[in-house]
């Protein structure tokens, strides 16, 4: 079995570091770091998630309450759901606590709506099929776009599309980009694109102008 490690201050545990700012007592708790690699090898992922769930079950069997910290909302592309589903199947009592989705927070920081009236809204993991997803009607949100920055930016420029982007939303290192031209070729993992078609409301407003 892979070794689990204590999640200590200098580890890159984003959710843990955020919680420490508002709940200092977390340092008094037993904190375990469960590796969640961002890979596409399905068999390897199943093995890792099975091990992580079994390890968590051991803590529950000791009579302890276990909290899985995650950023954003746990129901949206969150690694915690892989553990949650397994524990639920094993008969343990589980509960999901809703959070603020990154794309809602990003839209608020950019001071824009995500959709209006009959506009469609598409939430897309940027690591899968950027070009195909761009053909969707309505607002496209590409989450965790850091590794696909160059590809997304190139497609936007080649097709004369306007986009906005937020990097590290809500963090000290947050950066806002209000146009395709401003968006860099490279950015961090927590980069989120918002690409909007012109909505009917906007068209009506433009006609009024």
Predicted features and spans:
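Short, small-residue-biased leader/transition segments that mark boundaries at the very start
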Residues: 3-8
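Short gly/pro/ser/thr-enriched loop/turn and capping motifs at secondary-structure boundaries
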Residues: 9-12, 101-104, 171-173
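Conserved Motif II region of HX4D acyltransferases
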Residues: 62-77
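Class I SAM-dependent methyltransferase SAM-binding "motif I" and its flanking Rossmann-like core
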Residues: 75-136, 184, 198-201
């Amino acid at each position: 079995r892979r070794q689990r490690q204590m999640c200590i201050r200098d580890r890159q545990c984003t959710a843990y570091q955020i919680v420490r700012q508002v709940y200092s007592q977390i340092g008094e708790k037993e904190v375990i770091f469960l590796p969640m690699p961002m890979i596409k090898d399905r068999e390897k992922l199943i093995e890792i998630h099975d091990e992580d769930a079994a390890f968590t079950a051991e803590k529950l069997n000791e009579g302890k309450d276990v909290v899985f910290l995650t950023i954003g909302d746990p129901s949206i592309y969150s690694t915690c759901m892989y553990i949650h589903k397994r524990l639920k199947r094993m008969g343990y009592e589980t509960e999901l606590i809703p959070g603020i989705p990154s794309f809602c927070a990003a839209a608020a920081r950019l001071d824009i709506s995500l959709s209006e009236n009959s506009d469609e809204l598409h939430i897309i993991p940027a690591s899968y099929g950027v070009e195909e997803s761009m053909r969707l009607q309505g607002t496209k949100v590409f989450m965790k776009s850091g590794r696909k920055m160059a590809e997304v930016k190139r497609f936007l420029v080649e097709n004369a599309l306007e986009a906005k982007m937020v990097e590290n939303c809500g963090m000290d290192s947050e950066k806002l980009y209000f146009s395709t031209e401003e968006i860099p070729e490279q950015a961090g993992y927590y980069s989120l694109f918002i690409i909007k078609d012109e909505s009917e409301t906007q068209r009506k407003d433009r006609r009024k102008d």
